[in-house]
Swiss-Prot record:
A motif (Nuclear export signal) lies at residues 16-22. It comes from Human immunodeficiency virus type 2 subtype B (isolate UC1) (HIV-2). A motif (Nuclear localization signal) lies at residues 26-32. PANTHER family: ENDOGENOUS RETROVIRUS GROUP K MEMBER POL PROTEIN (PTHR41694), RNA-DIRECTED DNA POLYMERASE-RELATED (PTHR41694:SF3). The lineage of its organism: Viruses, Riboviria, Pararnavirae, Artverviricota, Revtraviricetes. Zn(2+) binds at H1182, H1186, C1210, C1213. The gene is gag-pol. This is Gag-Pol polyprotein.
């Protein structure tokens, strides 16, 4: 340490601590950097004392400077540190590392220039070392220094052929000759296996060199020969020859660099052998610091033999992809391609010392908290341990595990057969007995023969031979010592509950009362001398009592229960006396509806909860075809989590929910633990994501939650809960193996214990569906037997409602509970609700009414986007019962792309809306239940700002209310919004009640009919009545369809220069009037609107306006009354003032009178004239064939707006919208066929489902023979494998069946508008008839016009997938299918092979690439997304799993003729 401590004096040390590591950074140099630099110097053979002076640092820098450009990160860091120390010795003031480097490099350059030219070595152009030096014009070889050789040997010995060896060799061998490189290799004494691998690579590369560089003819005397492979390797050449080859004037051969590259290939192979970790396996642990993960990643990356582009891709994708979830979340927020410095800075706090310190502090706090010692444990501590006796042979001095005698059969505890000691009834006393599936005990007290009833007893209760039969009795030893304990269970309840005493059961512990659970287990206890009655509740984590005072030494705490959150006082180390036993535990006091002893006290008493497993047949489950179960290693866990998981798993194993996995089970899924809400208990979680991916898919059996408004009104209601629902359903035994998980041990002290689930696990994708299916099977018989009783079941919540008498209703509930208990389901008493109000699914229910549970809006100083989202969710939930709830302005606060944690600034409108909602929520609102036979009605009311409210009711009884505030269009009107409201209510009513209500809408029938006649957009209009509830929905202005006669006509236009944003808007009238307005910072659309507004302002009460803008026409035609645009709002106000308005649209300016004139008027200096010569041919084409919009756009190059207007202007192409139906089978060979009728003729139509291609013709009769002939004609033209028709007589005839059988196609039948129906051909019949109507006047006979219409539909109708016509699409699909089949057949030969290859003069092998094709002279390979052609002599083909026979190493390694014959015969090449 002498040199280390004397590197810098005290003053210089102070100066060092002021220097920053990076310019502008926060971190500064400290002493640890000097200590690190001293250790690193030893690797380069440099003395530590050199750092003590300026001259010594200068010497270090002269050695390191040539190595910096090709050196590792450690080398560069060492160089930077020495630069800083050099500046401190030279008394140079520096602020950061970069300044120090500049100063040091300036001094190095000056010293080099001062050296004499004859003595200064001139480095060859290839490197920074100087084995070959140019002195006086001659190249002289200087042997490698011992320092260099020592550094190389130390590198190999320390790193053991790690990833650092390759760049280290590159740096140390820079500029070396083969002689020098061989000297370096000979210095490595050990690792001869690695040396042999390098020698084999050298021999292989030398042979390739000789093959590529054949020996030329005889050379003239005195001329230097060209190097052979052995010359490059230094075995048959001298140092002088090597120098001449490297530095000759003509055709130099860098033998040193070539040999270095061969050695690098060998070293990389050794690195992969010594370090088998793949770069893909480098993943960050859950608590691993990000910097440590990055170090491991780059260490493995440096060992990868691939090009820099691939390494760059690995850095950009794998580094983030394989980070743990915490770091990955932070890294994704950095955007695309963050730098490594940004990633390290962002993740430095995750998994680092700070986080570890917090975890350690939390663990230490928990460890220092004195845990209450159970009574039995205290007894064992108090007494001395007796002599060890073997349970197997009975001898003293060893345990059963050490016993060498044959294993005794049966139980080691009681000697009986049929069970093992861990499950012995005399050893294990539980809160609930585990009931077998074969013989179940009744939960009701009237079953006297129920043996094994659920009981409570403390551990080590009765002695051997103890009789515990009889579900409602107390065991004999307990009965003899419990005083009045027999009265406790007499008829399930007792008027007087006396304290019970317990007796010590000899040396076996103690005996406690055991009592039936057919009633609530309520006992009397004394807490610090204060008597209370408490419920023993195994479902509660903590213990809470009311009505007692325990002093002021408490901690305030809030706990959650059925009724919400409760404020409590927590007292620790409180003395409790219960069932004759004293314990000390933590207890809370507060306003609880019932006193509860939870698991913290029950565990101290030694009580356990044993759940039965349901007697339900397991549902068979399989993995997806070709998939295997998860095999993911368990990641490291902290000590406290391991202990918590161990306790949880042991408990679940005792309860029959888990069992040990056999050692032959190869599957594993990671497990971990998290703290519960109270932060005192742990919850076990299994990461089933991989298992969910490979598990078969399940059907969602329940698509939503039930709503109380859909319940029928009943006299009595009861709510009960199924406890630990998933853990009551058995899992398919054949599938259990895939749920295996492992509990690791601390410091790997023992093998991890492995478990598999016997019941439905939480987190597995199949658990919800299987549970719902099982519950439906259990409840269906009960529902049928009690048809007058309503049973609503959602997951583990069950609601029972009936009009029966109280006694009959209670009997039904008891029968249902008994049924569930007999099937193995538990029904916890603490969640059993017999009296109103019933808390169910977020609602409070009474027999005659329902309401929402209390809603409390949050009060916050600072609001984030996430807070606003939660607030809107609460308000939307409340809107189903509270009328008038609005969220429009609150939702506007989070419009646009915002992060969840971004702070939100409230607007005045949003604050006012929130306050109004708070006032509404303060009022009491109640809903009613549904009454059969009473008409269902829906009343809609319009509020301000386009917000709508509605109520669904039966007379004056309100069932449900709601709101609607979605505005899908920027410019809209009330009728369109009203239509959306009606659709929403209709869907809602169908789901809840299964019927459509009668609507009361605030609109006049004339307004509604007028709007829907012109702008029909939906397929369903309900029955409705007019309601005169202001404000009424009205159409604000009179927009007529035909031009007004004797009224001035305005031609409007606007234009804008995109570069300058300057524009003009104006109009020209048919009476010679015109006007132009100059605009700034505008757009074409805004200019068009300005021109329209000018025409409205300057015109009279009646006006004709002609526009050439589809944008303006679309806005005006929709008759908007609401808009967010000030300009459109101005237009609306002007239009309201008019008596009548006609608005027309023209597509072109040429030859259209005033429209052409106004275009010239506003275009001067603004835009060029748009030539639309192709409009007239497009109109002629459409009048002939009536093609669609996309066909006109494709063929004539028209803008889509112009093409759309051409189609819309055609009176024969005007049609209403069509309903959207279910999906159909769209495979390539699927056709649908149907018959339709027109003009007394029968037209048979066949449609190719995938492409929409149609075949149609007129047939004489609708018979099976004619249909079969058409089917044969269709099959002779197109591939057909599946035909779908309706159930008509001609399609089900024997003729059609025989034709289908002969062709080899599958025929199916269906009904309209089902997913497997003939809906495609039904729709095509409609389109065919429309097309025939358009061209009917072009042909005489119906036969001709049908074929003409089919031609138009197949070749003149473009759109859909690929923007093709149906004919193009069908041909494309057939061609694609053939290509796929061809390439699949070819690819099967090569799919198991990979190719390593070399390119150009580069001798480095690259790959692997995927083999696509193997020809005689070359192979076709795929590398990433790039496809390459590689000569055979530069390619090696191997099996991807390695170890196979190489096929292409050159002409001497494969018989070309044999390979060609094999490829031609279609065989797969052998590996």
């Amino acid at each position: 340490m002498g040199a280390r401590s004397s590197v810098l004096s005290g003053k210089k040390t102070d100066e060092l601590e002021k220097v920053r590591l990076r310019p502008g950074g926060k971190k500064r140099y400290c002493l640890k950097h000097i200590i690190w630099a001293v250790n690193e110097l030893d690797r380069f053979g440099l003395a530590e004392s050199l750092l003590e002076s300026k001259e010594g640092c200068h010497k270090i820098l002269t050695v390191l400077a040539p190595l910096v450009p090709t050196g590792s990160e450690n080398l560069k860091s060492l160089f930077n540190t020495v630069c800083v120390i050099y500046c401190l010795h030279a008394e140079e003031k520096v602020k950061d590392t970069e300044e120090a480097k500049k100063i040091a490099q300036r001094h190095l350059a000056a010293d080099t220039e001062k050296m004499p030219a004859t003595s200064r070595p001139t480095a060859p152009p290839s490197g920074g070392n100087y084995p070959v030096q140019q002195i006086a014009g001659n190249y002289v070889h200087m042997p490698l220094s011992p320092r260099t050789l020592n550094a190389w040997v130390k590198l190999v010995e320390e790193k053991k052929f790690g990833a650092e060896v390759v760049p280290g060799f590159q740096a140390l061998s820079e500029g070396c000759t083969p002689y020098d490189i061989n000297q370096m290799l000979n210095c490595v004494g050990d690792h001869q296996a690695a040396m042999q691998i390098i020698r084999e690579i050298i021999n292989e590369e030398a042979a390739d060199w000789d093959q590529q560089h054949p020996i030329p003819g005889p050379l003239p005397a005195g001329q230097l020969r060209d190097p052979r492979g052995s010359d490059i390797a230094g075995t048959t050449s001298t140092v002088e020859e090597q120098i001449q080859w490297m530095y000759r004037a003509q055709n130099p051969v860098p033998v040193g660099n070539i040999y270095r590259r061969w050695i690098q290939i060998g070293l990389q192979k050794c690195v992969r052998m010594y370090n088998p970790t793949n770069i893909l396996d480098i993943k960050q642990g859950p608590k691993e610091p990000f910097q440590s993960y990055v170090d491991r990643f780059y260490k493995s990356l440096r060992a990868e033999q691939t090009d820099p582009a691939v390494k760059n891709w690995m850095t950009q994708t794998l580094l983030i992809q394989n980070a743990n979830p915490d770091c990955k979340l932070v890294l994704k927020g950095l955007g695309m391609n963050p730098t490594l410095e940004e990633m390290l800075t962002a993740c430095q706090g995750i998994g680092g010392p700070g986080q570890k310190a917090r975890l350690m502090a939390e663990a230490l706090k928990e460890a220092l908290t004195p845990a209450p010692i159970p009574f039995a444990a205290a007894q064992q501590k108090a007494g001395k341990r007796g002599t060890v006796t073997c349970w197997n042979c009975g001898k003293v001095g060893h345990t059963a595990k050490q016993c060498r005698a044959p294993r005794r059969q049966g139980c080691w505890k009681c000697g009986k057969q049929g069970h093992i000691m861990s499950k012995c009834p005399e050893r294990q006393a539980g809160f609930l007995r585990v009931r077998t599936l074969g013989k179940e005990a009744s939960q009701l007290p009237h079953d006297p023969s129920a043996s094994g009833s659920d009981t409570i007893c403390t551990p080590d209760g009765p002695s051997r031979g103890h009789d515990t039969s009889g579900g409602d009795t107390i065991c004999a030893p307990c009965r003899s010592s419990s005083g009045d304990a027999e009265k406790l269970h007499e008829d399930g309840e007792t008027a007087e509950r006396e304290p019970r005493e317990t007796l010590q059961g000899g040396d076996r512990g103690f005996a406690a009362p055991q009592f039936s659970l057919w009633r609530r287990p309520v006992v009397r206890a004394c807490i610090e001398g204060q008597p209370v009655e408490v419920l023993l509740d195994t479902g509660a984590d903590d213990s809470i009592v009311a009505g007692i005072e325990l002093g002021s030494n408490y901690t305030p705490k809030i706990v959650g229960g059925i009724g919400g959150f409760i404020n409590t006082k927590e007292y620790k180390d409180v003395e409790i006396e219960v069932v004759g036993k004293r314990v000390r535990a933590t207890i809370m006091t507060g306003d609880t509806p019932i006193n509860i002893f939870g698991r913290n006290i029950l565990n101290t008493l030694g009580m356990t909860l044993n759940f039965p497993v349901a007697k339900i047949e397991p549902v068979k489950v399989k993995l997806k075809p070709g998939k295997d179960g998860p095999k993911i290693r368990q990641w490291p866990l902290s000590k406290e989590k391991i202990l918590a998981l161990k306790e949880i798993c042991e408990k679940m194993e005792k309860e029959g929910q888990l069992e040990e996995a056999p050692p032959t089970n190869p599957y594993n899924t990671p497990t971990f633990a998290i703290k519960k809400r109270d932060k005192n208990k742990w919850r076990m979680l299994i990461d089933f994501r991989e298992l969910n991916k490979v598990t078969q898919d399940f059907t969602e059996v329940q698509l939503g939650i039930p709503h109380p408004a859909g319940l029928a009104e009943k006299r009595r209601i009861t709510v009960l809960d199924v406890g630990d629902a998933y853990f009551s359903i058995p899992l398919d035994p054949n599938f259990r193996q895939y749920t295996a998980f492992t509990l690791p041990s601390i410091n790997n002290a023992e093998p991890g214990k492995r478990y598999i689930y016997k019941v439905l696990p939480q987190g597995w994708k199949g658990s919800p569906a299987i549970f719902q299916y099982s519950m439906r099977k259990v409840l269906d018989p009960f529902r049928k037997a009690n048809s007058d009783v309503i049973i609503i079941q959602y997951m583990d919540d069950i609601l029972i409602a009936s009009d029966r008498s109280d006694l009959e209703h209670d009997r039904v509930v008891s029968q249902l509970k008994e049924l569930l208990n007999d099937m193995g389901f538990s029904t916890p008493e603490e969640k059993f609700q017999k009296d109103p109000p019933f808390k169910w699914m977020g609602y409070e229910l009474w027999p005659k009414r329902w309401k929402l549970q209390k809603i409390q809006l949050p009060e916050k100083e600072v609001w984030t986007v996430n807070d606003i989202q939660k607030l809107v969710g609460v308000l939307n939930w409340a809107a189903q019962l509270f009328p008038g709830i609005k969220t429009r302005h609150i939702c506007k606060l989070i419009r646009g792309k915002m992060t969840l944690t971004e702070e939100v600034q409230w607007t005045e409108l949003a604050e006012a809306e929130l306050q109004e909602n708070k006032i509404i929520l303060e009022q009491e609102q109640e809903g009613s239940y549904y009454k059969e036979g009473v008409p269902l009605e829906a009343t809609v009311q319009k509020n301000l700002a386009n917000q709508w409210t509605y109520k669904i009711h039966q007379g004056n009884r309100i069932l449900k209310v709601g709101k609607y505030a979605k505005v899908k269009n920027t410019h809209t009107n009330g009728v369109r919004l009203l239509a959306h409201v009606v659709q929403k209510i209709g869907k809602e009513a169908l789901v809840i009640w299964g019927e459509i209500p009668v609507f009361h809408l605030p609109v006049e029938r004339e307004t509604w009919d007028q709007w829907w006649t012109d702008y029909w957009q939906v397929t369903w209009i309900p029955e409705w009545d007019f309601v005169s509830t202001p404000p009424l929905v009205r159409l604000a202005y009179n927009l007529v369809k035909d031009p007004l006669e004797k009224v001035e006509t305005y031609y409007t236009d606007g234009s804008c220069n995109r570069a300058s944003k300057e524009g003009k808007a104006g109009y020209v009238t048919d009476r010679g009037k015109d006007k132009v307005k100059v605009l700034e910072q505008t757009t074409n659309q805004q200019a068009e609107l300005e021109a329209f507004a000018l025409a409205l302002q300057d015109s009279g009460p009646q006006v004709n306006i002609i526009v050439d803008s589809q944008y303006v026409m679309g806005i005006v035609a929709g008759q908007p009354t609401e808009t967010e645009s000030p300009l459109v709002n101005q237009i609306i106000e002007e239009m309201i003032k008019k008596e009548a308005i006609y608005v027309g649209w023209v597509p072109a300016h040429r030859g259209l009178g005033g429209n052409q004139e106004v275009d010239h008027l506003v275009s001067q200096g603004i835009r060029q004239v748009l030539f639309l010569e192709k409009i007239e041919p497009a109109q002629e084409e459409h009048e002939k064939y009536h093609g669609n919009v996309k066909e006109l756009v494709h063929k004539f190059g028209l803008p889509q707006l112009v093409a759309k207007q051409i189609v819309n202007s055609c009176d024969k192409c005007q049609q209403k919208g069509e309903a959207v139906h279910g999906q159909v089978n769209a495979e390539l060979g699927t056709w649908q066929m149907d018959c339709t009728h027109l003009e007394g003729k029968v037209i048979i139509v066949a449609v190719h489902v995938a492409s929409g291609f149609i075949e149609a013709e007129v047939i004489p009769q609708e018979t099976g023979r004619q249909t079969a002939l058409f089917l044969l004609k269709l099959a002779s033209r197109w591939p057909i494998t599946h035909l779908h028709t309706d159930n008509g007589a001609n399609f089900t005839s024997q003729d059609v069946k025989m034709a289908a059988w002969w062709i080899g196609i599958e025929q199916t039948f269906g009904v309209p508008y089902n997913p497997q129906s003939q809906g495609v051909v039904e729709a095509m019949n409609h389109h065919l008839k429309n097309q025939i109507d358009r061209i009917r006047d072009q042909a005489v006979s119906i036969e001709t016009v049908v074929l003409m219409a089919a031609h138009c539909m197949n070749f003149k109708r473009r759109g859909g997938i690929g923007d093709m016509t149906p004919a193009e699409r069908l041909v494309n699909m057939i061609t694609t299918e053939q290509e796929i089949q061809f390439f699949q057949a070819k690819n099967l030969k090569f799919q198991n092979f990979q190719v390593y290859y070399r390119e150009g003069r580069d001798q480095l092998w690259k790959g692997p690439g995927e083999l696509l094709w193997k020809g005689e002279g070359a192979v076709l390979i795929k590398v990433g997304t790039e496809i390459k052609v590689i000569p055979r002599r530069k390619a090696k083909i191997i099996r991807h799993y390695g170890g196979g026979k190489e096929l292409d190493c050159g002409t001497d390694m494969e018989d070309t003729r044999q390979a060609r014959e094999m490829a031609q015969s279609g065989q797969v090449p052998e590996a």
